[in-house]
Amino acid sequence: MTRRIFGLETEYGITYAHPTDDVTLSADEVARQLFKKVVAWGRSSNVFLRNGSRLYLDVGSHPEYATAECDSVEQLIAHDRGGELILVDLIDDAQRRLAQEGYTGTIHLLKNNTDSAGNSYGCHENYLVRRQGDFTRLADILIPFLITRQVVVGAGKIMSTPQGPRYCFSQRADHMWEAVSSATTRSRPIINTRDEPHADAEFYRRLHVIVGDSNIAEPTTFLKVGATDMVLRLIEAGVPMRDLALDNAMRAIREISHDITGRATVTLSSGKTVTAWQLQEMYVEKVRTYVESLGPLSPTDEAVFELWERALRAVETQDHSLIDRDIDWAIKKRLLDRTQDRLGCALDDPRLARLDLAYHDISPATGLGHRLVSRSMMNRVVSDAEVERASQVAPETTRAHLRGRFVTAAQEQKKDYTVDWVHLKLNDQAQRTVLCKDPFAHVDDRVDQLIDSMRTQAT
């Protein structure tokens, strides 16, 4: 597909730090406080917003934000970051109310993937693919890529092991149990095969990737989604690809993550052994050859290739300075290394654990991301203005535009309505419903008429 629909679903960790409070608040209680403002206007903790996104409380009191449908990687990043702005606003509102009730602690919303109890929550990537074609072939080619891409797009994690603490590439790697499955929590596959296209099922299916880490640095998300998109283009074009299947995928994903030198070797089904960066090089070379054969590269493709190849060079040479402003695991490692040197402490020191968490804290007041950007220690892909707009306005080039307009009009006219990814429904006497099955369609006369009817009734 030369044009693709993308989406990110991010589950957030939530905690309440209370150094002086006598009464603590559980994650459930904090989550309820966080969503009070949402429930007040939406009458539910599961709502679609004016910017086309979905915001809800997931299992385990994890706030989850699902971006609207986006048709470029840059647009997706803006809307992912826009979700952070929305959640920070909810944090501030809940914080004020708790302060009025005498609570002096701080709510922390963490864009990470594991908690102190060993539970994992995810960042799920969604890629629209055409129904035609062999999905088994797609998965077979994609799985080795997804397992090894952690060396260039992992979020980094301090992990306790029987051999002592170690710094790993990925937060999600140790929580994966299958390559492909229709489950999401019980067995946690790399690719979820549950067939929910949120589009015309005759033509499309939704590739649901749940192996990835949640990223703080925008360039890491840019590479994660951009490189995956280009590998999908290669597969969809039917370009022959040598068999890179791993002999033991679940062992490989863990062994790769645990060796921050990038030199851990994994065994292919053919019996050959390779490192993760060598396997990634095979993909990037094949993809570059294919994409360049189609004509001049787009600025986005150029930027993806540049960062992808630079990140692999950093892993191969161990020169992390090549990427320690762009790639999460390298940025965080630089911070941890400097702090460890300054304090003269071990990697399992609680102060380093707090630093690790602060890296993933999305609040400008308590998190590190905003400070790193302001000090030129973390690069950007999109502007503050683009993020601010994305927090309020749906993408104008996809179906999300229709949903955003409908939700905005219904709220302004105080109409009762129901929405999901495909349906727009007015809960009036006529129960009028519009089915929007084409995720690329941003213009629809039926939606225009539905919106006009609301405004006509109001006059």
From Swiss-Prot:
<comment type="function">
    <text>Catalyzes the covalent attachment of the prokaryotic ubiquitin-like protein modifier Pup to the proteasomal substrate proteins, thereby targeting them for proteasomal degradation. This tagging system is termed pupylation. The ligation reaction involves the side-chain carboxylate of the C-terminal glutamate of Pup and the side-chain amino group of a substrate lysine.</text>
</comment>
<keyword id="KW-0479">Metal-binding</keyword>
<feature type="binding site">
    <location>
        <position position="67"/>
    </location>
    <ligand>
        <name>ATP</name>
    </ligand>
</feature>
<dbReference type="GO" id="GO:0016879">
    <property type="term" value="F:ligase activity, forming carbon-nitrogen bonds"/>
</dbReference>
<keyword id="KW-0547">Nucleotide-binding</keyword>
<dbReference type="GO" id="GO:0019941">
    <property type="term" value="P:modification-dependent protein catabolic process"/>
</dbReference>
<protein>
    <recommendedName>
        <fullName>Pup--protein ligase</fullName>
        <ecNumber>6.3.1.19</ecNumber>
    </recommendedName>
</protein>
<feature type="binding site">
    <location>
        <position position="56"/>
    </location>
    <ligand>
        <name>Mg(2+)</name>
    </ligand>
</feature>
<dbReference type="GO" id="GO:0019787">
    <property type="term" value="F:ubiquitin-like protein transferase activity"/>
</dbReference>
<dbReference type="GO" id="GO:0010498">
    <property type="term" value="P:proteasomal protein catabolic process"/>
</dbReference>
<dbReference type="InterPro" id="IPR004347">
    <property type="entry name" value="Pup_ligase/deamidase"/>
</dbReference>
<dbReference type="GO" id="GO:0070490">
    <property type="term" value="P:protein pupylation"/>
</dbReference>
<feature type="active site" description="Proton acceptor">
    <location>
        <position position="58"/>
    </location>
</feature>
<feature type="binding site">
    <location>
        <position position="9"/>
    </location>
    <ligand>
        <name>Mg(2+)</name>
    </ligand>
</feature>
<comment type="pathway">
    <text>Protein degradation; proteasomal Pup-dependent pathway.</text>
</comment>
<feature type="binding site">
    <location>
        <position position="421"/>
    </location>
    <ligand>
        <name>ATP</name>
    </ligand>
</feature>
<comment type="pathway">
    <text>Protein modification; protein pupylation.</text>
</comment>
<dbReference type="GO" id="GO:0000287">
    <property type="term" value="F:magnesium ion binding"/>
</dbReference>
<keyword id="KW-0436">Ligase</keyword>
<keyword id="KW-0833">Ubl conjugation pathway</keyword>
<dbReference type="Pfam" id="PF03136">
    <property type="entry name" value="Pup_ligase"/>
</dbReference>
<dbReference type="GO" id="GO:0005524">
    <property type="term" value="F:ATP binding"/>
</dbReference>
<keyword id="KW-0067">ATP-binding</keyword>
<feature type="binding site">
    <location>
        <position position="64"/>
    </location>
    <ligand>
        <name>Mg(2+)</name>
    </ligand>
</feature>
<feature type="binding site">
    <location>
        <position position="54"/>
    </location>
    <ligand>
        <name>ATP</name>
    </ligand>
</feature>
<comment type="similarity">
    <text>Belongs to the Pup ligase/Pup deamidase family. Pup-conjugating enzyme subfamily.</text>
</comment>
<dbReference type="InterPro" id="IPR022279">
    <property type="entry name" value="Pup_ligase"/>
</dbReference>
<keyword id="KW-0460">Magnesium</keyword>
